[in-house]
Amino acid sequence: MTNKSPHPSIILGSTSPYRAALLQKLNLNFQQAAPYFDEQITPTSLAPRDIAINFAKEKAESLREQFPDHLIIGSDQTAALNGLLLRKPGDKATAIKQLAACSGESVTFYSGLALINTRLNTTRTCVDWQTVYFRDLSREEIERYIELEKPYDCVGSFKVEGLGISLFEKIEGKDPNTLIGLPLIELITLLKKEGLRIP
C-alpha cells in the first residue's frame, strides 16, 4: 500500500515564464506543462469574461489524463474595448492598429482561472478583471513601443511586465497580477479551498 501526499502535486498548465514567476511568489512546489488547446477557436457568442473562464477550464482539462493525481491550474486572458473582444495581434501591423484603437480609451482585461483536482475529480473556476486607461498615444510612440517589445502574442498589444506600463494613465482592479494573466488573490482562495496552507 502506498501513502499518498495530503495534497496532490501542482501543475501550472502554461509555459509562460511570467505566470511561473507569479506562482513562485506563493512558495509552492509546481511544474509546468503545455496545455493541448487551440486558442484560435473562439466562440463569438460568449462575452469576453466567459471566454476567459471557458478557455482556462479547457486548458486545465486538456492535461487531466496526463496528470491523474494532481492539482492542475489553467488560466486564460481576454480583453474588451468598448465591449468588443481584442485578440492577440500576431503581427506588427495589427499590433499598431490595436494600440491606436486603445489610445485614450479604457480596456478591461479578464483573467479566467480553473483549478482541477484530478484526484477528487473536482473543478473550481473564477475570473478577475483589471481596467486599463490608456494615455493618448501618438503614432510615433506606438510604433516605437511596438518595435522595442514586439508584443505580437499579447492580448492588447503590450507587455505590462515590461515597457507596456508606460502606455497607461491608470489601472483599476484588486490584483495587479491579473494583467500578467494569473490573478494570485483569486488563486490563493481556490487553493485554500483544496486544503493548501498559504502562507
From Swiss-Prot:
Annotated HAMAP family: Maf
Tagged with keyword Cytoplasm: yes
Entries under InterPro entries matching the protein: ITPase-like_fam, Maf-like
EC number: 3.6.1.-
Keywords for the protein's UniProt record, in alphabetical order: Cytoplasm, Hydrolase, Nucleotide metabolism
UniProt function note: Nucleoside triphosphate pyrophosphatase that hydrolyzes 7-methyl-GTP (m(7)GTP). May have a dual role in cell division arrest and in preventing the incorporation of modified nucleotides into cellular nucleic acids.
Source species taxonomy: Bacteria, Pseudomonadati, Pseudomonadota, Gammaproteobacteria, Oceanospirillales
Organism: Hahella chejuensis (strain KCTC 2396)
Catalytic activity reported: N(7)-methyl-GTP + H2O = N(7)-methyl-GMP + diphosphate + H(+)
Catalytic residues (UniProt): D76
UniProt KW Cytoplasm keyword: yes
Example of a GO biological process term: nucleotide metabolic process
Enzyme class: hydrolase
SUPFAM superfamilies (UniProt xref): ITPase-like
Residue numbers marked as site, Important for substrate specificity: Y18, Q77, E161
Entry-linked Gene3D superfamilies: 3.90.950.10
Segments passing through the bilayer: none
Family: Belongs to the Maf family. YceF subfamily.
Cofactor(s) needed for function: a divalent metal cation
Subcellular location(s) of the protein: Cytoplasm
GO MF assignments: nucleoside triphosphate diphosphatase activity
Main location group: cytoplasm
Any one cellular-component term (Gene Ontology): cytoplasm
Name of the molecule in the record: 7-methyl-GTP pyrophosphatase
